[in-house]
């Protein structure tokens, strides 16, 4: 079972918006037997026993009132610690594979909730935006966390994803949250509300112009930009090459540019050039909106 990479926040949609795209994917294989326990093997790396997949399974078992002996193998092709939802996609792919293999019926929201709670292992607190995108696909808006409610849209949008090859920042998510402002002026709050509304309206109508308006952000991105390698040059080059919008992907260091067909190649080349001029190796891909692991 595969779950796609995701880009959360998209500018003004901090902690509530994510889009699934086909730039990368995580794949999980499971074997289900009688008994109770979860054994997880990750191809190519070892996150330790306290990982998002194991924790997500514990939450799912509690929610369903069941327990099974599950052997999981995760093949995660999403670059790790790059702001592309790698940990959440691993958990979603594993839970979706288990539900299919065990012949269970589970509400998609339960999978999103269990995987989101599993994010505590990677980020220190629950996060539902990335996992909702990986599970449901399309563009998602987390409208409530208690109770959990997620709205999915299926917009036809095109992105260019830039992934710089830089050393991971220890406890990156915690750091990137610690730099955020604790208060904002009321005028800024109103402007941010308008931009989030533009994001949602753009998703609902597949209107890239509205989505681009929502990708402009005066609260989170200015605080995080100094910690994102090559951000200023990448943003400038992408917009000059015809990108409609530009944002940090999740907590970075990856970035995502909204493009149209006409400018996708030019923006991809511009991002690659920006990273090269910064002395950074990077992978830059054109990506479409993807379906989620649950196929809903």
From Swiss-Prot:
Keywords: Amino-acid biosynthesis, ATP-binding, Cytoplasm, Kinase, Nucleotide-binding, Threonine biosynthesis, Transferase
Gene Ontology terms describing biological process: threonine biosynthetic process
Keyword Ion transport on entry: no
EC number: 2.7.1.39
Gene3D superfamilies: 3.30.230.10, GHMP kinase, C-terminal domain (3.30.70.890)
GO molecular function annotations of the record: ATP binding; homoserine kinase activity
GO CC list: cytoplasm
Chief location bin: cytoplasm
Top-level taxon in the UniProt lineage: Archaea
Positions of ATP binding: 79-89
Locations listed in the record: Cytoplasm
Pathway the protein takes part in: Amino-acid biosynthesis; L-threonine biosynthesis; L-threonine from L-aspartate: step 4/5
Leader sequence segment: none
Family from the record: Belongs to the GHMP kinase family. Homoserine kinase subfamily.
NCBIfam families for the chain: PRK01212.1-4 (NF002288)
Task performed by this protein: Catalyzes the ATP-dependent phosphorylation of L-homoserine to L-homoserine phosphate.
PANTHER family on file: HOMOSERINE KINASE, HOMOSERINE/4-DIPHOSPHOCYTIDYL-2-C-METHYL-D-ERYTHRITOL KINASE
Name of the protein: Homoserine kinase
The organism of origin for this protein: Pyrobaculum calidifontis (strain DSM 21063 / JCM 11548 / VA1)
Recorded name of the encoding gene: thrB
């Amino acid at each position: 079972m595969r779950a796609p990479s995701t880009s959360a926040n998209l500018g003004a949609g901090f902690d509530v918006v994510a889009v699934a795209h086909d730039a990368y994917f995580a794949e999980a294989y499971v074997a289900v037997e009688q008994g109770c326990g979860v054994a997880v093997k990750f191809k190519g790396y070892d996150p330790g026993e306290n990982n998002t997949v194991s924790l997500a399974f514990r939450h799912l078992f509690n929610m369903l009132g069941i327990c099974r002996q599950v052997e999981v193998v995760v093949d995660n092709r999403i670059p790790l610690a790059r702001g592309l939802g790698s940990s959440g996609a691993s958990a979603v792919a594993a839970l979706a594979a288990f539900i299919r293999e065990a012949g269970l019926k589970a509400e998609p929201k339960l999978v999103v909730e269990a995987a989101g709670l599993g994010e505590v292992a990677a980020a220190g607190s629950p996060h539902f935006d990335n996992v909702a995108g990986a599970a449901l696909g399309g563009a998602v808006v987390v409208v409530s966390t208690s109770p959990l409610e997620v709205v999915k849209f299926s917009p036809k949008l095109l992105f260019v994803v830039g992934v710089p090859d830089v050393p991971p920042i220890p406890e990156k998510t915690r750091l990137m949250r610690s730099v955020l402002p604790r208060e904002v002026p009321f005028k800024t709050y109103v402007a941010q509300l308008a931009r989030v509304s533009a994001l949602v309206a753009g998703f609902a109508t597949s209107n890239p112009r509205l989505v681009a308006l929502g990708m402009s952000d005066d609260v989170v991105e200015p605080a995080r930009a100094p910690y994102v390698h090559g951000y200023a040059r990448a943003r400038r080059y992408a917009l000059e090459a015809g990108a409609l919008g530009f944002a940090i992907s999740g907590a970075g260091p990856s970035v995502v540019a909204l493009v149209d067909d006409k400018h996708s190649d030019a923006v991809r080349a511009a991002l690659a050039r920006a990273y090269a001029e910064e002395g950074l190796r990077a992978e830059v891909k054109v990506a479409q909106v993807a379906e989620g692991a649950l196929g809903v």
